[in-house]
Amino acid sequence: MLISKSKMFKTFWILTSIVLLASATVDISKLQEFEEYQKFTNESLLWAPYRSNCYFGMRPRYVHESPLIMGIMWFNSLSQDGLHSLRHFATPQDKLQKYGWEVYDPRIGGKEVFIDEKNNLNLTVYFVKSKNGENWSVRVQGEPLDPKRPSTASVVLYFSQNGGEIDGKSSLAMIGHDGPNDMKFFGYSKELGEYHLTVKDNFGHYFKNPEYETMEVAPGSDCSKTSHLSLQIPDKEVWKARDVFQSLVSDSIRDILEKEETKQRPADLIPSVLTIRNLYNFNPGNFHYIQKTFDLTKKDGFQFDITYNKLGTTQSISTREQVTELITWSLNEINARFDKQFSFGEGPDSIESVEVKRRFALETLSNLLGGIGYFYGNQLIDRETEFDESQFTEIKLLNAKEEGPFELFTSVPSRGFFPRGFYWDEGFHLLQIMEYDFDLAFEILASWFEMIEDDSGWIAREIILGNEARSKVPQEFQVQNPNIANPPTLLLAFSEMLSRAIENIGDFNSDSYHQVMFNSRTAKFMTNNLEANPGLLTEYAKKIYPKLLKHYNWFRKSQTGLIDEYEEILEDEGIWDKIHKNEVYRWVGRTFTHCLPSGMDDYPRAQPPDVAELNVDALAWVGVMTRSMKQIAHVLKLTQDEQRYAQIEQEVVENLDLLHWSENDNCYCDISIDPEDDEIREFVCHEGYVSVLPFALKLIPKNSPKLEKVVALMSDPEKIFSDYGLLSLSRQDDYFGKDENYWRGPIWMNINYLCLDAMRYYYPEVILDVAGEASNAKKLYQSLKINLSNNIYKVWEEQGYCYENYSPIDGHGTGAEHFTGWTALVVNILGRF
């Protein structure tokens, strides 16, 4: 096989093969077609910039024993403090004017652009692959932002062939020069095999002063040519490439200054002083730095290619012209695939043109896809700390132990702020990704489901694997605990996937759907094979169902509420016997001011907190999980399970109305026991996202009169409707805009998206172009869709980025910058709704 795949995929595909061989209706050729699909998936997704936290960092997917790790860094070495502006990890502190993908598809490649005013650099990185996915090339191209400003672009590449030495020799070694500044390496990986790695200049002017006989200030410190240093760095420390580089160059500077204390060096020799050299006479090792320093007073800039070719490959990339051709083909192919999935017709909005709208959507989707990463390592878990639910104080997780290693293939909310997997976010990411590449969304979903613990059914709310991922997380959030949940959005996404497959085939339980198989001849032009061929999804559902059942049961058990506290109250109200006692829930782990498990951290809850508090959103998410499990059981023909889930779903829906609907407030609310009178059920009503969640998750019956009341709330400009989207909390609420102000007014795309989607479900006429006066729902749908998408576009046009959330006052971007996680759902709104 090409790679050592994870246990998950080995098991899945072996199971599929057994099922096919056992079926009388499927011949060997069909089995071969399944194997071709597997091969296509593994090859097309093997290589990509899967180090989400880096501006550009490569590693292969599901290769963890001996991966080749690669990264790009840069700085202005003409500045004495240039090392402080060395770019490596994506971080808001760098204050780049722009960074991100303009066009990107992990199966194909793309174009990433960096505008770095401090370093006077307009840097473009192209990433392309051979058609079979085995080989790749990275083209690094830079131009000065201001050629009149004296500066350099000192670009630092690093490569590490992890996995140790082979027969006492380095597993990645330089084997020659094809030119004065071109280098060739031979590498070997236990999983990838043998390969060549080349670095070749196309054009550019290395920094030098023609008046000087030499630019060398110490042996090896010469900025007028490519500098190379090889050394041994432990695999677990490779992610510290920036720190190691800064340390080695700083030591070199001190050595130079100590040896020539009285000599005053000209300013244009500073780039040589800031060039890496082998000061300590390291023996060659698995790790390599390559530093190229270009003169940015030359308008034409510079360009060089980094190329990886597997030995024995049939599709090697060997010339500059081939790289150029692959770049052209890749960008054209991605654009064609994008246009096939999304349509941007003229509409009654203020976006200037279809092409501008399309460019915004393509860039936004590209940055969501560009955040996809492969993570491998240990996770910190505290299984000892006990939760005292009566205190409602922040619980310190001080008994963490490393567990693992684990692996996760996932997208991330933000490369600069949150470059790791978030359970709450990922389901929303998949709702967008599946519209472009259904099979890719499935690969991510399957990786997450593999994180379900076999014994307990728990999934951590954040997956933080290894030191590189952990370095970007505040210490107080690094440790996970099995008592804490998060909204189960992954099942929301899986339910949508199954719905798509059912729609495409018709009767999912008929025998005919098994006959629709993968077509190997068209695979390389299709990324929705699983959507069109539900047999694969069914076999996967069979494999994963026991784990999903454990996860479902874990969530219900861990978040169960205390209904007995309400017995006398509800008996007095005459509804105790109608209540379904097993379907009441609250979020475990809330404090006086925050409820992190709910995902809506500071959204106002009952004050003071009480152990008897019941949360309407926790119940609603159980409804979503149950509906998804019912659908899976239907697909698998598990009739008794399906009936049981249908019963639980009905009980959830009834409890939403019986327990959480306030007739006085006309909305869904949390409930608690009145702190001043323990014989009264208190409706804790804070109109906002929690109030509309049963609607957004399609849990209200279609014939319910409550639908119109929820629509009225969403339409009210005095409450949560605005020119920029639905506010997270009503303007009239006492907590609006107060304190941290995270979910107390700011506009979030994920809930807005669910509300728009729910309106399409409850009111099909909202998308129909029919004459006559529009209904309240249609007016809301049309105005919300336009307001939301126009504001996100406007902020992107002005600032260059999507944001985590948006101001309820004037719509400007707030929270994390360059947040193309669930905010990227704007692409669906523009191109699909």
Swiss-Prot record:
Reaction it catalyzes: N(4)-(alpha-D-Glc-(1->2)-alpha-D-Glc-(1->3)-alpha-D-Glc-(1->3)-alpha-D-Man-(1->2)-alpha-D-Man-(1->2)-alpha-D-Man-(1->3)-[alpha-D-Man-(1->2)-alpha-D-Man-(1->3)-[alpha-D-Man-(1->2)-alpha-D-Man-(1->6)]-alpha-D-Man-(1->6)]-beta-D-Man-(1->4)-beta-D-GlcNAc-(1->4)-beta-D-GlcNAc)-L-asparaginyl-[protein] + H2O = N(4)-(alpha-D-Glc-(1->3)-alpha-D-Glc-(1->3)-alpha-D-Man-(1->2)-alpha-D-Man-(1->2)-alpha-D-Man-(1->3)-[alpha-D-Man-(1->2)-alpha-D-Man-(1->3)-[alpha-D-Man-(1->2)-alpha-D-Man-(1->6)]-alpha-D-Man-(1->6)]-beta-D-Man-(1->4)-beta-D-GlcNAc-(1->4)-beta-D-GlcNAc)-L-asparaginyl-[protein] + beta-D-glucose
Keyword terms: Disulfide bond, Endoplasmic reticulum, Glycoprotein, Glycosidase, Hydrolase, Membrane, Signal-anchor, Transmembrane, Transmembrane helix
Spans within the Cytoplasmic topological domain: 1-10
Effect of substituting residue 804 to A/N: Abrogates catalytic activity
Catalytic residues (positions): 601 (proton donor), 804 (proton acceptor)
GO BP, one annotated term: protein N-linked glycosylation
Record-annotated membrane-spanning stretches: 11-28
One annotated Gene Ontology cellular component of this protein: endoplasmic reticulum membrane
A molecular-function term among this protein's GO annotations: Glc3Man9GlcNAc2 oligosaccharide glucosidase activity
UniProt activity-regulation remark: Miglitol is an effective inhibitor at 1 mM.
EC code: 3.2.1.106
Glycosylation sites: 42, 122, 135, 787
Posttranslational mods: N-glycosylated.
Chief subcellular location: endoplasmic reticulum
Record's bilayer topology term: Single-pass type II membrane protein
Cited function: Cleaves the distal alpha 1,2-linked glucose residue from the Glc(3)Man(9)GlcNAc(2) oligosaccharide precursor highly specifically. Seems to play a role in beta-1,6-glucan synthesis.
Protein name (record): Mannosyl-oligosaccharide glucosidase
Gene that specifies this protein: CWH41
